[in-house]
Design a protein with these regions (language model features):
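C-terminal regulatory domains involved in ligand/effector binding and gene-expression control
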Residues: 2-6
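Concave beta-strand-loop units of leucine-rich repeat
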Residues: 73-80, 93, 99-105, 116-134, ...
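Short, aromatic/basic amphipathic alpha-helical patches
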Residues: 163-171
Length: 183
């Protein structure tokens, strides 16, 4: 293979993994469809009432549609990207999201996350770590997550105006506990 073609192939494959299948969402419900998307992309999900992280696509629980509700998402080292974020729209019980070393997460993803009505109501904890494409703009977009109680930010070199960004965010979300580990 010529140099760069492997990267192009993986980029194409990741885009395929992130393509939203609206018929699938209708057929199996938002939580099952989102679980399939997240696991396909290398993320983990935890369902309500379960202490265990689900990581095996083939091990997804079966049962009545709507029985398993996603409560937490750990997207460490996953290939989730903006293109797949429509899967998040129908999720009503997600309280905790961790985005760590997600090379495709960028400001538009955080903006999309914060504009998702159900997440505005349910999301309480968000951790963003080592996502090199995130800038101040993406962090400022999080102000719409009005129920967010805890935000952890670490190793985000794209954040340049730290003091201003965090002051604006704290004013918008006065109950937010903000933990920073930034250079």
């Amino acid at each position: 293979l010529p140099p760069g073609s492997c990267r192009a192939f993986w980029g194409w494959l990741n885009a395929v993994f992130n393509k939203v299948d609206h018929e699938r969402i209708q057929a199996v419900g938002p939580d099952r469809a989102a679980s399939e998307w997240l696991l396909r992309c290398g993320a983990l999900v935890r369902f309500q009432g379960s202490p265990r992280w689900q990581q095996d696509y083939n091990g997804l629980p079966t049962g009545p549609l709507g029985k398993y509700k996603i409560e937490a998402i750990n997207a460490t080292d996953s290939c989730i990207m903006y293109r797949g974020f429509d899967y998040l729209d129908g999720l009503e019980h997600v309280r905790d999201i961790k985005l760590e070393k997600c090379m495709y997460i960028q400001d538009e993803c955080l903006q999309r996350l914060s504009e998702t009505n159900n997440l505005q109501k349910s999301l309480q904890q968000l951790k963003i770590i080592s996502c090199g494409n995130v800038t101040d703009r993406g962090i400022l977009a999080l102000h719409k997550l009005t129920n967010l109680e805890y935000l952890y930010l670490s190793d985000l070199p794209g954040i340049r105006e730290k003091e201003t960004t965090f002051r604006v965010l704290q004013q918008a979300l006065p109950k937010l506990e903000l933990e920073l580990d930034l250079e």
